[in-house]
Amino acid sequence: MISILTYFGILFGILTITVIIFVALNKIQLI
């Protein structure tokens, strides 16, 4: 059984990685 904290932890982790990749792609396009 997955706890709520674990669920939000994984969700926050995926969201953070997505944001980092999005920012990285934007920086590459700006150059």
Swiss-Prot record:
The chain crosses the membrane at residues 4-24. It comes from Chaetosphaeridium globosum. Disulfide bonds: none annotated. This is Cytochrome b6-f complex subunit 6. Component of the cytochrome b6-f complex, which mediates electron transfer between photosystem II (PSII) and photosystem I (PSI), cyclic electron flow around PSI, and state transitions. PetL is important for photoautotrophic growth as well as for electron transfer efficiency and stability of the cytochrome b6-f complex. It comes from the Eukaryota. Belongs to the PetL family. It is found in: Plastid, Chloroplast thylakoid membrane. InterPro entries: Cyt_b6/f_cplx_su6 (IPR007802). Its main location: plastid. GO terms for biological process: photosynthesis. It is a single-pass membrane protein. One of its GO terms (molecular function) is electron transporter, transferring electrons within cytochrome b6/f complex of photosystem II activity. The 4 large subunits of the cytochrome b6-f complex are cytochrome b6, subunit IV (17 kDa polypeptide, PetD), cytochrome f and the Rieske protein, while the 4 small subunits are PetG, PetL, PetM and PetN. The complex functions as a dimer. GO terms for cellular component: chloroplast thylakoid membrane; cytochrome b6f complex. Keywords: Chloroplast, Electron transport, Membrane, Photosynthesis, Plastid, Thylakoid, Transmembrane, Transmembrane helix, Transport. Pfam families: PetL.
